[in-house]
């Protein structure tokens, strides 16, 4: 979508890249998966520390067929070991209202285990 490219361009222009490319790719993939799980319910079981018990989860608010991520960036947050994935998305809720330019931020912390760094999503508070 042409409008989505403009949103992506504006995000990148407003918030210059400050993470290594590999970290940015991993964070973007995780952020997109988290947003899809949060909005549609699909894949929540993969994130128990974020969504809790999948058997007690709330019904998803958005239909998977009417959900799309318009733009996304991953950037450092307050320290080198924290990051935020900023996502702009569109979706139709269960009531049939379609809205675009919704904004969601997911926060991550970096930990090292056996010399390998991993990014862990933080639950919302």
Language model region names:
Residues 39-125:
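Structured, amphipathic secondary-structure segments that form assembly/contact surfaces
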Residues 1-65:
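Core segments of small alpha/beta cavity-forming domains
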